[in-house]
């Protein structure tokens, strides 16, 4: 089998790149739903249906395991698909299939605790000693997944989300770096104003943002730790494959890149990040 990696666009390539480095012999199929990107401003029901369609396309391409390398899809659609759609689809196809996301590994990295751990609540107020900023799409911010799930595990962490409605679209379109820099600086300043100071740590809660992580570092105070989703996801996938040997990621080093958009319409930001051009096939 192959491992499928799904995103609304090219941002998930940041996760895919790290997975390929971590599992160089494994087979991978990447799907970018660029015809519908970005997902961040869409209603929840649309996000669920688009994510389901992407998973089906990757299953049809020979993947048994799909990683949602899209915070919006993972935060809005993953749990619902796992609970209400995937069990029936497994029975229908007779295949052992699963869908994972990048939010769980990110929360594990942010809290230093396994997903299964939830803090005991004793009723007393816990002082918030650690301020964590989350830069994300509007849909991810509306879901409050980071606030809710981190608070379950670390009540001493205060989470502040800063929705960045235009940023993923700009990165997807290959906007000039100076324009991206100005937008990022504006969102960092907006978050600082709301908190009253800079965050102690930050999550780039959209995989597109990893492409311009250096601009976030420049906008944040020097030395502000960034929780890196590609690394956290690769670590989590390694643990998952160890626990589930039935998901064999293959050994031929297959690399396929699919898009629902125009195959030749990839931008220079992606090529710079990847280290060269990528050849996409129509999905």
From Swiss-Prot:
Write down the EC number.
Answer: 5.1.1.3
Q: Recall the GO molecular function terms of this protein's record.
A: glutamate racemase activity
The biological pathway it contributes to is: Cell wall biogenesis; peptidoglycan biosynthesis
- Provide the alphabetized UniProt keywords: Cell shape, Cell wall biogenesis/degradation, Isomerase, Peptidoglycan synthesis
The yes or no answer to whether the keyword Isomerase is present is yes
What is the reaction catalyzed?
L-glutamate = D-glutamate
Please, which domain of life does this record's source organism belong to? Bacteria
Q: Which residues form the active site?
A: 70, 206
Q: Which GO terms describe its biological process?
A: cell wall organization; peptidoglycan biosynthetic process; regulation of cell shape
Query: Which residues make up the binding site for substrate?
Result: 7-8, 39-40, 71-72, 207-208
- Pfam families the UniProt entry points to: Asp_Glu_race
Give the UniProt family note: Belongs to the aspartate/glutamate racemases family.
- What this chain does, per the record? Provides the (R)-glutamate required for cell wall biosynthesis.
Q: What is this protein called?
A: Glutamate racemase
| The species this protein was found in | Phenylobacterium zucineum (strain HLK1)
Q: What is the lineage of its organism?
A: Bacteria, Pseudomonadati, Pseudomonadota, Alphaproteobacteria, Caulobacterales
